[in-house]
């Protein structure tokens, strides 16, 4: 009996630890892993989301780079399109990833540099409908080398 109780607690602890560090599906707006860490210029990362009632998003982006990434910064455009295909919100971003000497601004972990970057705090979509969330990379050379994964998250 004692052994069964101990096993139950060990199993419960393992399941809790496995769940830590992973995003729940309802927090992920869009996600893409890049084959061979290459991202073509007009290969948009997007996802359609059905909005049923007024919703507020607190958006951030987790993006991972490899040593092959050639730039000190990352430029992108984040756009939300309404159900008619019209831009609802759009903004260009430029994030500094490395210092002037080319050293990363974050420690390397699991063979990549992973940044969590603020995108849009308190984005409110009032009208119901199908909306498309899109991220477009704006770096000058294509394909962009060294991007491993991108995740747009709702932190609410």
Residue locations for each model-derived region?
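C-terminal motif of bacterial Sec signal peptides marking the signal peptidase cleavage site
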Residues: 18-19
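Bacterial N-terminal signal peptides that target proteins for export
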Residues: 1-9
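An anionic, turn-rich surface loop/hairpin at beta-sheet edges
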Residues: 92-124
